[in-house]
Design a protein with these regions (language model features):
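Short, structured helix-loop boundary elements
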Residues: 9-13, 69, 82, 86, ...
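A short, aliphatic-rich beta-strand micro-motif
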Residues: 176-182
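Amphipathic alpha-helical regulatory segments at dimerization interfaces
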Residues: 22, 38, 87-99, 103-105, ...
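N-terminal helix-turn-helix
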Residues: 1-79, 219-226
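Amphipathic alpha-helical effector-binding/dimerization core
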Residues: 65-154
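Flexible loop/coil segments at beta-strand boundaries within sensory signal-transduction domains
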Residues: 183-188
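Histidine-centered metal-chelating micro-motifs
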Residues: 103-105, 135-136, 166-167, 177, ...
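Juxtadomain coupling helices with adjacent low-complexity linkers
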Residues: 156-157, 163, 167, 173-175, ...
Length: 235
């Protein structure tokens, strides 16, 4: 038995971790009663843990209960920055920003939704698009469509699979995103997107922006060891 396996479990730490894990994309806010029931403790105990986590910035109190706090976002961003895909993608994203003069965003799948792991801002435009690292994106975002098409194999997204591009301009008014898949081996590992105003990002897979994005994602995928189906057959 390893030393780690024999180590005693700190019940307070374990319970605090379980409390934080109760929150999800589907349930970003929970009442104290819901926390109490799911944690399997008394209301007083649940309140004590929630109060301690709130003071640490890991929970935020709302009029009806709690949501995850701002410190969670900071910790998530720190963890995500250590991912290999973030480090390898950096130079490619910087070159793409310089080429197209738009903000470039990299997202990975956390099991439920796309999560932003790196943002390279366009600093030359009058209007800058601020995308926060650690943000979870909707499933109908451009990045969400990429994961739904290539990782989840959803029906109704054949156009995305054929073109290798997904567009959305309905998440935030006036803002559009165009995304492409990034593969490692034969698996989807990330979605790379151009984000800008609807005037700057066209819904056109044949545009210069679309071509530049698609080529950058393909070069990054090749660096990560992606082989096209025809290359796998001859390898």
């Amino acid at each position: 038995m390893s030393v780690e396996a024999r180590a005693p479990v700190n019940q307070s730490v374990e319970r605090a971790a379980r409390l934080l894990a109760l929150f999800s994309v589907e349930e970003p806010e929970l009442t104290l009663a819901e926390v109490t029931t799911r944690l399997g403790t008394s209301k007083a105990t649940a309140h004590r843990y929630a109060t301690a986590l709130r003071r640490a910035g890991l929970l935020r109190a709302t009029p009806s209960g709690y949501t995850l706090g701002p410190r969670i976002v900071e910790l998530a961003a720190t963890a995500l920055a250590g991912l290999r895909i973030v480090q390898v993608a950096g130079p490619h994203m910087e070159r793409l920003v310089a080429a197209v003069n738009e903000t470039v965003v990299l997202s990975v799948w956390d099991g439920e939704a796309p999560v932003v792991v790196r943002v390279d801002d366009n600093t030359n435009r009058l209007v800058r698009i601020n995308v926060r690292t650690g943000s979870r994106l909707p499933l109908d975002s451009a990045q969400g469509k990429i994961f739904r098409a290539f990782a989840l194999g959803e029906e109704g997204l054949d156009g995305v699979r054929r073109s290798g591009l997904a567009f959305n301009a309905r998440i935030v008014e006036g803002i559009a995103a165009l995304a492409a898949p990034v593969f490692q081996g034969d698996e989807l590992v990330a979605a790379m997107a151009l984000v800008g105003t609807t005037a700057a990002i066209p819904d056109d897979v044949r545009s210069e922006l679309a071509r530049a994005l698609h080529e950058t994602a393909a070069v990054l995928s090749a660096e990560l060891g992606f082989l096209r189906p025809e290359e796998r057959r001859t390898a």
